[in-house]
Amino acid sequence: MDGSNLAWNGRPPRAASGRPSFAALEAAVRSLQFKHLGRDIHVVADATLRHDVSAEERPRVEAAIADGKVVQPPAGTEGRGDALVISIAEEVGGVIISNDNFAPFQKANPWLRDAGRVLGATYSQGVWVFNRRVPNPAMPTRPRTTRSL
């Protein structure tokens, strides 16, 4: 589970002084556990999550990390949390829960676009809903062109 992505779900962006909600992430985990009894759920969060949440939620984030309920990628990990989410899913043959397209990773991990490998998450009127989705295809990068004046 892309914990950082779900914690930001439905929240105002950082540029508008928004903050992720750890309570929302915890609710998503509980909902997923209820809907998929007996399944292992790996929650991955970027290192910035503990700093971005409100001061009131910060101790809960730190406790979840200390208890191993939430994992963070090691410092300096290329691709940060997204890379760890993908690596865990690949290692265990799991399904990724995220609304991210993982565009920078699609070429090296074509299975990301296979049906059933990614579920999107939506919070609506107190209910978390998880639907199959196929990430948008990564756009090929174009070489930059320069114009002379």
Identify the function of each model-found stretch.
Residues 1-13:
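Metal-dependent nucleic-acid phosphoesterase active-site entry motif
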Residues 6-9, 26-30, 37-149:
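Nuclease catalytic cores that cleave nucleic-acid phosphodiester bonds
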Residues 12-29:
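…and closely analogous acidic/polar surface helices at protein-protein or active-site interfaces
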